[in-house]
Each structure stands twice: as structure tokens, then as C-alpha cells.
């Protein structure tokens, strides 16, 4: 059994300019997915495209908006609202006052990934070698 708390996740956190991602489970845990708690900093709009991963996201605190740039549409996010990027949609995630979301990635992240110029995470092998950018 894996049991981790917020302090454990802080040790593997990635702090980018627009958000902080605390990673609770990663590839080495063998779960087939990774679980992250991500805080979107106030006034941010993140342009993303997870071309190598699928992601499910549920808002747990604050409010924001998700805009689907691939299929169209925009939705308000508040605690309890989930969205899933089932077709690798390009999207913009934004929040005026800050928002915390719980994210599940498949395949799981290795750990140190951060977004590239396209807003995507590269795909790494178990040993940390790059498979696909």
C-alpha cells in the first residue's frame, strides 16, 4: 500500500511560473497512472496540449475555466466539476483568483516533467530516457 501526505508530495513538486504541481504518485509506483495536485496561480491562463498523455481533472478548490481549442466549447470550473482530455485536446486552463485541481495522467509521469513550448509533457521511459517529445 502506498500512503503519502502533502509534505511527501512537496518533495516531488514542480513549480513553474504559472502553477505548482505536487506529485503524489509517479511511474515508479507502478500504478499505471500518476496523481497530481496542481495549484493554478491567480491570473494565469495555461495553453496546453498533452499529445503524449490523457488527463482527467477535478476542481477541488477555487474557480476557473477550461476552453477546448480542438473541438470547441468552454466550461466553468468549481469544486466538484471534472473534465477529461480523452482525445489529446489542445486547451486553455485559466483562473483569475487561483484554483486547485486534482489531476490523473495516463501514462504516468516519471516525475520532473515540465511543459514544453507546445504545452505538452514529453514521454519518458521508466529509466528516464526520452521516448517521444
Give a label for each model feature.
Residues 37, 74-76, 90, 98:
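Well-ordered beta-strand positions in beta-sheet-rich domains
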Residues 36-38, 57, 102:
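Conserved hydrophobic/aromatic positions in well-ordered beta-strands
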Residues 65, 87-114:
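Ligand-binding loop in jelly-roll beta-barrel domains
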Residues 52-65:
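Glycine- and acidic-residue-biased ligand/ion/polar-headgroup-sensing regions
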Residues 34-51:
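Conserved short histidine dyad/triad with adjacent acidic residue
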Residues 1-33, 118-133:
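A short, N-terminal "cap"/entry segment at the start of jelly-roll beta-barrel domains
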Amino acid at each position: 500500500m502506498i500512503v503519502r501526505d502533502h509534505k511527501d508530495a512537496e518533495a516531488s513538486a514542480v513549480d513553474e511560473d504559472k502553477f505548482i504541481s505536487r506529485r503524489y504518485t509517479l511511474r515508479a509506483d507502478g500504478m499505471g497512472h500518476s496523481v497530481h495536485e496542481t495549484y493554478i496561480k491567480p491570473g494565469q491562463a495555461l495553453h496546453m496540449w498533452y499529445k503524449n498523455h490523457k488527463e482527467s481533472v477535478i476542481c477541488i478548490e477555487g474557480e476557473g475555466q477550461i476552453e477546448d481549442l480542438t473541438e470547441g466549447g468552454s466550461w466553468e470550473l468549481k469544486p466538484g466539476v471534472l473534465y477529461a482530455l480523452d482525445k489529446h485536446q489542445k486547451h486553455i486552463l485559466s483562473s483569475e483568483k487561483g484554483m486547485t485541481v486534482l489531476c490523473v495522467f495516463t501514462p504516468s509521469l516519471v516525475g520532473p516533467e515540465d511543459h514544453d513550448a507546445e504545452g505538452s509533457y514529453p514521454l519518458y521511459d521508466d529509466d528516464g530516457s526520452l521516448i517521444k517529445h
